[in-house]
Amino acid sequence: MDRHQGPQPRREAKAPIRSSFSDDPEMRELVDYFLGDLTRRIESLRSALDADDAHALRRLAHQLAGAAAGYGFDEIGQAAHGLDDGISHEMAVSDARERAEDLIELCSRAIRAVPGEGHAP
């Protein structure tokens, strides 16, 4: 840390995530549907984490991996696939928890990109 600049923030605010289809008028309604469902998916992921339910977490990640990629959210799809694949290969619980939290953060960033949405869960 440069002592002349003062303390640096611990985490930079990360930019919202937008669908690669966000400028496609034919896909707008479908993308909006997916985004509207993300809050429920986040809540389900958190519930599975709280219950230490690896089976549910893997199922949710698997479903989200396919859906996110199909709606133009490749970053979310890749993160969800990584969680799904990791759990299927018996990754450590701490690693699964970290990947799930990262996935939840990505989903929250996508929700924050929606006009009129002030925050995400």
Report each predicted region and the residues it spans:
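Two-component system phosphorelay core
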Residues: 1-59, 63-121
